[in-house]
Amino acid sequence: RVNYSLLKRYIFEFSAREDGSSKFPSNQRWGFFPSGSIGWRLSEEPWMKATRGWLDNFKIRANAGALGNGTVAAYAFLTTMGMKKTTAVFDGTLQNKVSDPSVVPDNLTWEKVATYDIGLDADFLKSRLSFSGDYYVRNTTDLYINGPEIPATFGDSTPKGNYGALQTKGWELTLSWRDQFKMGGKDFTYSIKGSL
Protein backbone atom coordinates (compact mmCIF):
# COMPACT_ATOMS: atom_id res chain seq x y z
CA ARG A 1 0.00 0.00 0.00
CA VAL A 2 1.25 3.48 -0.91
CA ASN A 3 -0.16 6.72 0.53
CA TYR A 4 0.81 10.24 -0.47
CA SER A 5 -0.50 13.60 0.67
CA LEU A 6 0.51 16.87 -0.99
CA LEU A 7 0.06 20.11 0.97
CA LYS A 8 -2.57 18.34 3.11
CA ARG A 9 -4.96 18.93 0.23
CA TYR A 10 -4.31 16.32 -2.43
CA ILE A 11 -4.44 12.72 -1.26
CA PHE A 12 -3.47 9.65 -3.27
CA GLU A 13 -3.55 6.00 -2.28
CA PHE A 14 -2.75 2.83 -4.18
CA SER A 15 -2.82 -0.75 -2.98
CA ALA A 16 -2.68 -4.17 -4.57
CA ARG A 17 -2.87 -7.77 -3.50
CA GLU A 18 -2.23 -11.07 -5.16
CA ASP A 19 -4.23 -14.03 -3.86
CA GLY A 20 -3.66 -17.69 -4.57
CA SER A 21 -5.89 -20.71 -4.07
CA SER A 22 -5.50 -24.42 -4.77
CA LYS A 23 -9.23 -24.54 -5.60
CA PHE A 24 -8.43 -23.39 -9.14
CA PRO A 25 -6.46 -24.99 -11.97
CA SER A 26 -2.78 -24.04 -12.19
CA ASN A 27 -3.31 -21.44 -14.93
CA GLN A 28 -5.97 -19.62 -12.83
CA ARG A 29 -4.51 -20.15 -9.36
CA TRP A 30 -3.37 -16.58 -8.79
CA GLY A 31 -5.42 -13.40 -8.97
CA PHE A 32 -4.12 -9.82 -8.93
CA PHE A 33 -6.48 -7.22 -7.44
CA PRO A 34 -5.48 -3.52 -7.39
CA SER A 35 -7.29 -0.50 -5.97
CA GLY A 36 -6.70 3.23 -5.85
CA SER A 37 -8.25 6.43 -4.58
CA ILE A 38 -7.81 10.18 -4.87
CA GLY A 39 -9.10 12.93 -2.63
CA TRP A 40 -9.16 16.71 -2.65
CA ARG A 41 -9.60 18.68 0.59
CA LEU A 42 -11.11 21.88 -0.72
CA SER A 43 -11.33 23.27 2.82
CA GLU A 44 -7.51 23.55 2.87
CA GLU A 45 -7.34 25.67 -0.26
CA PRO A 46 -6.29 29.31 0.32
CA TRP A 47 -9.43 30.60 -1.39
CA MET A 48 -11.57 28.74 1.20
CA LYS A 49 -10.04 30.64 4.12
CA ALA A 50 -13.21 32.69 4.67
CA THR A 51 -15.18 29.54 5.54
CA ARG A 52 -12.89 28.26 8.29
CA GLY A 53 -15.00 29.74 11.05
CA TRP A 54 -17.77 27.24 10.37
CA LEU A 55 -16.41 24.71 7.84
CA ASP A 56 -13.79 22.40 9.36
CA ASN A 57 -13.39 19.94 6.52
CA PHE A 58 -14.72 19.55 3.00
CA LYS A 59 -13.34 16.75 0.84
CA ILE A 60 -14.38 15.16 -2.43
CA ARG A 61 -13.01 11.72 -3.28
CA ALA A 62 -13.14 8.94 -5.82
CA ASN A 63 -11.93 5.38 -5.69
CA ALA A 64 -11.91 2.23 -7.76
CA GLY A 65 -10.87 -1.24 -6.75
CA ALA A 66 -11.11 -4.93 -7.46
CA LEU A 67 -11.47 -7.93 -5.17
CA GLY A 68 -11.49 -11.64 -5.84
CA ASN A 69 -13.75 -14.26 -4.34
CA GLY A 70 -12.41 -17.80 -4.18
CA THR A 71 -15.40 -19.36 -2.41
CA VAL A 72 -15.92 -22.29 -4.74
CA ALA A 73 -16.13 -26.01 -4.12
CA ALA A 74 -12.71 -27.52 -3.47
CA TYR A 75 -11.11 -28.95 -6.62
CA ALA A 76 -14.26 -28.42 -8.67
CA PHE A 77 -12.02 -28.28 -11.76
CA LEU A 78 -11.03 -31.95 -11.35
CA THR A 79 -12.98 -34.90 -12.74
CA THR A 80 -13.95 -37.23 -9.90
CA MET A 81 -15.48 -40.67 -9.65
CA GLY A 82 -17.07 -42.25 -6.61
CA MET A 83 -18.05 -45.67 -5.36
CA LYS A 84 -21.66 -46.60 -4.74
CA LYS A 85 -23.77 -49.71 -4.16
CA THR A 86 -25.62 -51.38 -7.01
CA THR A 87 -28.78 -53.45 -6.91
CA ALA A 88 -26.83 -56.48 -8.08
CA VAL A 89 -26.30 -59.19 -5.48
CA PHE A 90 -23.32 -61.50 -5.75
CA ASP A 91 -22.38 -64.05 -3.14
CA GLY A 92 -25.06 -62.62 -0.85
CA THR A 93 -23.84 -59.00 -0.88
CA LEU A 94 -24.68 -55.86 -2.82
CA GLN A 95 -21.91 -55.02 -5.22
CA ASN A 96 -20.06 -51.72 -5.54
CA LYS A 97 -19.61 -49.83 -8.77
CA VAL A 98 -17.69 -46.78 -9.89
CA SER A 99 -19.91 -43.81 -10.72
CA ASP A 100 -19.66 -41.96 -14.01
CA PRO A 101 -16.99 -39.23 -14.14
CA SER A 102 -18.22 -35.83 -12.97
CA VAL A 103 -18.61 -33.02 -15.47
CA VAL A 104 -16.28 -30.12 -14.76
CA PRO A 105 -16.60 -26.45 -15.83
CA ASP A 106 -14.23 -24.89 -18.35
CA ASN A 107 -11.60 -22.43 -17.09
CA LEU A 108 -12.80 -22.16 -13.50
CA THR A 109 -11.48 -18.88 -12.09
CA TRP A 110 -11.98 -16.22 -9.42
CA GLU A 111 -15.17 -14.25 -9.08
CA LYS A 112 -14.17 -10.62 -9.62
CA VAL A 113 -15.85 -7.64 -7.97
CA ALA A 114 -14.97 -4.17 -9.30
CA THR A 115 -16.30 -1.22 -7.29
CA TYR A 116 -16.37 2.46 -8.31
CA ASP A 117 -17.29 5.15 -5.81
CA ILE A 118 -17.44 8.94 -5.70
CA GLY A 119 -18.28 10.83 -2.56
CA LEU A 120 -17.83 13.83 -0.33
CA ASP A 121 -17.24 14.42 3.37
CA ALA A 122 -17.95 17.63 5.27
CA ASP A 123 -17.60 18.67 8.91
CA PHE A 124 -19.11 21.86 10.30
CA LEU A 125 -19.20 23.85 13.55
CA LYS A 126 -16.03 22.45 15.14
CA SER A 127 -16.81 18.98 13.76
CA ARG A 128 -20.07 18.70 15.66
CA LEU A 129 -22.09 18.38 12.46
CA SER A 130 -20.88 15.86 9.87
CA PHE A 131 -22.15 14.82 6.47
CA SER A 132 -21.00 12.05 4.14
CA GLY A 133 -22.41 11.08 0.75
CA ASP A 134 -21.49 8.33 -1.71
CA TYR A 135 -22.59 7.03 -5.08
CA TYR A 136 -21.28 3.61 -6.05
CA VAL A 137 -21.40 1.06 -8.86
CA ARG A 138 -20.39 -2.55 -8.18
CA ASN A 139 -19.82 -4.98 -11.06
CA THR A 140 -19.42 -8.69 -10.36
CA THR A 141 -18.11 -10.85 -13.20
CA ASP A 142 -17.33 -14.56 -13.47
CA LEU A 143 -20.01 -15.18 -10.85
CA TYR A 144 -19.89 -18.79 -9.63
CA ILE A 145 -23.41 -20.14 -10.25
CA ASN A 146 -25.24 -23.11 -11.75
CA GLY A 147 -24.69 -23.47 -15.48
CA PRO A 148 -27.31 -23.12 -18.21
CA GLU A 149 -29.94 -25.79 -18.78
CA ILE A 150 -28.86 -28.64 -21.03
CA PRO A 151 -30.88 -31.44 -22.66
CA ALA A 152 -31.66 -34.47 -20.51
CA THR A 153 -29.99 -36.63 -23.14
CA PHE A 154 -26.66 -35.25 -21.91
CA GLY A 155 -26.99 -37.63 -18.97
CA ASP A 156 -25.73 -35.33 -16.25
CA SER A 157 -26.40 -31.94 -14.69
CA THR A 158 -24.49 -28.82 -15.65
CA PRO A 159 -21.64 -28.13 -13.23
CA LYS A 160 -21.32 -24.86 -11.37
CA GLY A 161 -18.96 -22.44 -13.06
CA ASN A 162 -18.20 -18.80 -13.85
CA TYR A 163 -21.38 -18.20 -15.83
CA GLY A 164 -22.89 -15.14 -14.16
CA ALA A 165 -22.59 -11.36 -13.95
CA LEU A 166 -24.27 -8.85 -11.66
CA GLN A 167 -24.34 -5.07 -11.31
CA THR A 168 -25.53 -3.13 -8.28
CA LYS A 169 -25.56 0.63 -7.88
CA GLY A 170 -26.85 3.06 -5.33
CA TRP A 171 -26.15 5.93 -2.99
CA GLU A 172 -25.61 6.36 0.73
CA LEU A 173 -26.08 9.49 2.84
CA THR A 174 -25.10 9.94 6.48
CA LEU A 175 -25.76 12.96 8.70
CA SER A 176 -24.61 13.11 12.32
CA TRP A 177 -24.45 15.54 15.21
CA ARG A 178 -22.07 15.11 18.14
CA ASP A 179 -21.70 17.46 21.10
CA GLN A 180 -21.11 17.59 24.83
CA PHE A 181 -22.23 19.69 27.77
CA LYS A 182 -21.80 19.83 31.53
CA MET A 183 -24.15 17.85 33.73
CA GLY A 184 -23.55 17.73 37.46
CA GLY A 185 -20.05 19.04 36.97
CA LYS A 186 -19.16 16.28 34.51
CA ASP A 187 -18.91 16.24 30.74
CA PHE A 188 -21.85 14.56 29.05
CA THR A 189 -21.40 13.53 25.42
CA TYR A 190 -24.24 12.63 23.08
CA SER A 191 -24.60 11.95 19.37
CA ILE A 192 -27.39 11.61 16.82
CA LYS A 193 -26.91 9.86 13.50
CA GLY A 194 -29.13 9.13 10.52
CA SER A 195 -28.42 7.22 7.32
CA LEU A 196 -30.14 6.61 4.00
Residue ranges, per PLM feature:
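Extracellular/periplasmic, surface-exposed regions of secreted and cell-surface proteins
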Residues: R1-L196
